Regions:
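C-terminal non-catalytic interaction/assembly regions of soluble proteins
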Residues: 257-407
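N-terminal phosphate-binding or glycine-rich loops at protein starts, especially the Walker A/P-loop
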Residues: 1-51
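Short glycine/serine/threonine-rich phosphate/pyrophosphate-binding segments
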Residues: 13-23, 46-47, 83, 91-93, ...
Length: 407
């Protein structure tokens, strides 16, 4: 019999708990699994020995389904970066000690790029130490959709659905007046513009906007931006713009640097924000029309009420696949989504070496972006559309979606 540990890390999503549900579901149905532990607050919970017995928290299918519709990370999260073991191996030895104490054979870590870095480092350390009876497997999660190897990341489809819907609603609101006005919406995405690109989905509802989509893959010029806006204002009263939070100028500097914090997180990433605000000020100063900036911020990653059924179902199945890989001893691997067909849409799951995925960025391909660098092409629309299909049969309580708490 095997004991299994699962944890979540990084930024929450609307689908990360569906992946957790898939892990638990597979483990509960496996005759080879005895205990199922959850680490509270990711790898930090392992280091602090803050583990809970998930068999006492999830006891039936209804609770598994409820977990799938619960946003954010039900086990909590963390931003802990493991040190290079060649410099300091203390954390690794602590982790192994805790895993040994609870007789854990399989550890599944659900998270994004930095979490896959943890899976990679821990797997290599175990291998270097000749420890073969502990298997570490990664399960992808990130609304940024910037993990390599996988066609798309669990959580991205739901965030894309929310963003497309939000732009469709904003477009209708902005066009009710005849006053010249510009609305600039900042979308998450430090290193890749996938989320911002999802704003194009609003056009499927008949919306003309967003009028411009600026991704961080394209060097950004405020002068060119202002020319775009001025030209569009000559054609229509309202202009709606989507911009990635991580847009940079030709010198590689964030345009938002003048308003961003100098602080960085534990992985060395700058806390960036304010791109839309910088552009709002530029429009106000150079064009002089009515202008507002909107930052979607956390809403785009926790709007479970608008989750994509495709995303949630795939995320749950991916969790089951990751659990199976762990039980089969496929250490140092990540469960990936492989798109086998677009029309009709179909996917399968595959275990890929996490060493080829960790610390790499999947950028938006050049042929998904128009020549002017201010919009996306039909290839992007074709890529995105299947990921947002379907709606969840959400359970409500007193008029509000019902959620589950694990700790």
């Amino acid at each position: 019999m095997k004991n299994l540990l699962v944890a979540q890390s990084g930024g929450p999503t609307s689908a990360i708990n569906a992946t957790l549900a898939g892990v638990i579901e597979n483990a509960l149905s496996s005759p080879s699994v005895d205990k199922i532990y959850g680490s509270v607050n990711g790898i930090q919970g392992v280091l602090n020995e803050n583990l809970i017995d998930l068999k006492t928290k999830i006891t039936n299918v209804s609770e598994l389904n409820l977990l799938c519709q619960t946003p954010a990370s039900a086990l909590g999260s963390c931003r802990v970066k493991l040190k290079d073991p060649a410099v300091c191996a203390d954390e690794y030895e602590t982790i192994i000690s805790v895993l040994r104490k609870y007789s854990i054979d399989c550890f599944i870590y659900i998270g994004g790029n930095d979490s896959m870095d943890t899976v990679d480092k821990l797997s290599k350390y175990l291998s270097d130490k000749g420890i073969t009876d502990i298997t570490v497997v990664g399960a992808p999660k990130t609304i940024d959709n910037d993990l390599c190897g996988t066609d798309h990341c669990p959580g991205f489809g739901s965030a894309a659905k929310y963003i497309g819907t939000t732009f469709a609603e904003l477009e209708r609101d902005c066009h009710v007046y005849t006053t010249k006005a510009v609305t600039i919406v900042e979308v998450m995405g430090r290193d890749a513009g996938w989320l911002t690109a999802a704003s194009c989905l609003a056009r499927a509802t008949g919306a003309k906007g967003p009028d411009f989509i600026y991704l961080c893959e394209v060097p950004f010029s405020i002068d060119t931006f202002l020319k775009d806006v001025k030209a569009k204002l000559e054609e229509q009263d309202a202009v709606i713009i989507a911009v990635s939070e991580g847009v940079k100028n030709k010198d590689g500097r964030y345009i938002s640097e003048e308003v961003q914090s100098s602080a960085v997180d534990s992985f060395g990433h700058s806390y960036i924000a304010g791109a839309a605000k910088v552009l709002e000020d530029a429009v106000r100063n150079e064009i002089g029309c009515k202008v507002r900036s909107i930052e979607l911020n956390l809403m785009q990653r926790c709007a479970a009420h608008l989750a994509s059924a495709t995303d949630i179902q795939e995320s749950r199945m991916l969790g089951k696949a990751a659990c199976q890989y762990a039980l089969e001893g496929a250490g140092g691997m990540m469960a990936a989504v492989i798109r086998t067909s677009n029309k009709p849409y179909a996917t399968e799951f595959k275990a890929l070496p996490v060493c080829d995925i960790a610390n790499a960025i999947k950028s938006v391909p050049a042929d998904y972006i128009n020549d002017a660098g201010n919009d996306v092409t039909e290839k992007m629309v074709d890529y995105l559309t299947p990921l947002i299909q379907g709606e969840m049969n959400t359970v409500y309580e007193n008029g509000i979606p019902k959620y589950i708490y694990l700790y």
